[in-house]
Amino acid sequence: MKTISIYTDGACSGNPGPGGWGAVLFHGDRVKEIYGGEPDTTNQRMEIKAVIEALKALKVSGWDVTVFSDSAYVVNAFNQHWIENWQRNGWRNSKKDAVANQDLWRELVHLTGLNRVRLEKVKGHAGNEWNERCDQLARQGIRELNGEG
């Protein structure tokens, strides 16, 4: 079976404010780094966006993909079946409010359907080499938005 591991992270300078996302993708001995940013966003949106952009970068389907994220928001949405509940409830949360970041969640649902994707929580800012690298990439996305390249 073809397997890929992905580390992701999002960051925001102010919340809301300029934000960035970063991801590192591993397949065998190949490593690919990607990042980007948005001028007016939130940290949570950037955490989701990092996973979306990483899955878009795969350009494959039917693979086993493990995504490592330090975002409890993203990991719990999948592993605690929040997304399934939101969909069943017409994209409303348990308080009957519209789900925040619905546009990104819908895109992520589509992309996760192309491969066998599982999410695992990693502790942020705890010395995990690849989580730290994703944080650096996300902050680079913010710097480039601010013209600091």
Question: Language-model features: where?
Answer:
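Short amphipathic alpha-helical face segments that pack within enzyme cores
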Residues: R45, K49-E53
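RNase H catalytic domain
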Residues: T8-P18, I52-R133, L137, G141-I142, ...
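Generic beta-structure capping elements
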Residues: F26-G28, D70
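Short beta-strand scaffold segments in enzyme catalytic cores
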Residues: W21-L25
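Extreme N-terminal starter segment of soluble prokaryotic enzymes
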Residues: M1-S5
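A short, polar/acidic, helix/strand-boundary loop motif
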Residues: D29-M46
